[in-house]
Amino acid sequence: YSSAKKGEWIIGRGWINDTWDDPSFPTKEDLDAVAPDSPVYLTRACGHAAWANTKAFETAGITKDTPDPAGGEFLHKQDGSLLGVVTDQAQDPFNKAIPSYTKEQIQKIVLLAQQEFFSNGLTSVQDAGSPEEWVEAWQELYEKERLKLRIYVSMRVLGRPNYQELMEGSLKFFKKGLRIGMYDNRLTARAYKISLDGSLGARSAWMLEDYEDQPGHKGNGKWTNDQLYSVLYEARRAGFQTWCHAIGDAANRQCLDVYEQLLKELPDKDARLRSEHAQIIAPEDIERFHKLGVIPTHQTVFLRTDKNVADARLGAERIKGAYAWRTLIDQGNPLPNGTDSPVESCNPFLSMYCAVTRKDEHLKPEGGWHPQEAMTREEALRSYTNWAAYAAFEEQLKGSIEPGKLADFVVIDRDYMKCPEEEIKDICSLQTVVGGEVVYETK
């Protein structure tokens, strides 16, 4: 491919080094060996790290002496040379160097995604951060009735912006205003997304204390509390629901602290502010979610790979506040579920299987990983239906099959509530219906 497209950017996504025989981060020389003449940029599955070759570093203007930006790192070898992996805000120079998608490419991507979602039994999705040009491209498809998927959008400034870029871009969204229930309740843009840290796999999740397996490193926070408050204040003033990507316990504490301040300044008993992932929470902060009414959203399918590294990264004490689904539910929190696709497969039944069993698709570990935090089958089902709808202010429209709600449903190949639990991951859609129209059916 690199020979045929010599000199053109080659971009991709999906590598997870934790599953390799050697889980060390790869090097730029690995890519140079197969594509020396084209810039190559491959994003890790989590989206919070990327692997690039020498040509990509040159094109982006990065050398071994380039200082790390706030909230990101250009990883180096012991001799001081560039390794070939960058994290979080350090991805920004590459994002700016890579040509933007055309409208036609954006539309092709969403139509391919739509078919993948329908075939997996999904009728609605909540999009975790898209810029205005993507939403405008989708609107054109809705007007032509080619896009039938229901999308609840959180607006986001694309790339890895600095604070000034973040505020300028965000104010444009807020000025545009809310768009609710467009195209027969198929498109809503009423949320705003901001990332507070990175991922556990990339060791860029922002922690209160050092990583157990990397002393001296706490990950990367992206904003000061004042910066975060100022942009979220503008979002709330404009009526937007806010989503904060927060993986580490420091990021979740910042999220809760700033939300608490916001709710004092702009009181709202039904704000439904969200922490996206709420993955690692200091034990003393867990009860604050219910107290403040902050919704902790989760991606239970993350367990299938994170269980391989989480104990080593976090240690015996911090793991008690990680992936704490049972604890959060028992305290009265709804727990909306998802997959963060394309971070993981969009298959909801694999995610529900992980929620119920605390195991990977290979039925490991025996007995489940920290099984005391598992969900019941009914809770896992609610996490993809009622609770997810509630998290999007759409519980009056969807989330259950009853008179007056949207005719969106899926016919599956076995009884989810009664099949052996190891079969939950194998459930598949026979027919997917959106608005009373069959949009997918097995042949």
Language-model segment annotations:
Residues 442-443:
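Extracellular/periplasmic ectodomains of large secreted or surface enzymes and adhesion receptors
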Residues 108, 232-243, 247-273, 277-278, ...:
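His/Asp/Glu-enriched, well-ordered alpha-helical/loop segment
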Residues 27-28, 175-176, 339, 419:
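Short beta-alpha junctions and helix-cap segments that line functional grooves
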Residues 186-204, 293-304:
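Non-cysteine beta-strand/loop elements that form the S-adenosyl-L-methionine
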Residues 141-145, 177-187, 266-268, 289-291:
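Acidic (Asp/Glu)-rich catalytic clusters
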Residues 1-171, 190, 194-251, 264, ...:
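Divalent metal-binding segments
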